[in-house]
Amino acid sequence: PTAADQVLIDMQQAFRKKDRVRLAQLLPQARGHALEPWAAYWELRARLEDAQASEVDAFLQRWAGTYQEDRLRNDQLLLLGQRRDWSRFAAMHPAFRMGDDREVRCYALTIAQIEGRAPQDAAAVLRENWFAQRDADDGCTHAAGELFSAKALPAIDVWRKARLAIEANRVRAARDAVAIVATDVLPQVTQLNDAPTKFLRAHSTAPG
């Protein structure tokens, strides 16, 4: 590889190692390279949790229309959702072109529910995304909690998620679902590790 190409290779390796210092050192050397958008993405993504909103906005403006722009928007939307920064999420979400992140969809559904504009098929939208998530996730779990609290999601759907998670050997996801629908049995939820089928059979008829 050329010297310029080696810079990109080194940056990719530094990104995988989460080496922020190395990324910052190498970024100036990537300027003008055909893959500079990736270099800029790796450098900012590695420190996104600490980045200023102005830095994120500047990146999105500079690389508008690129894959990396929308990829970072996706990352930022997930971060804003985790932080419950609904106003900034709502402002950024309409520009998200890929729209293929289930957790982002669930955060958007949460906002719609909070603002009283959830679609009539909100429960179906939630199920489609939540049930497809194998691992525990904050976005769809939070949306499920919001919809369940508003009586827009039946308990049977939450228990179904718990069963699906157990079948996939995803105990944390199952525990998160149980926490929504039956907090009274949470002290016993450790049984999910030892006898998950027995636990669900005993509690899946719990009121709620």
How would you name each of these model-derived features?
Residues 1-64, 69-208:
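Extracytoplasmic and endomembrane cell-envelope/extracellular-matrix remodeling and assembly machinery
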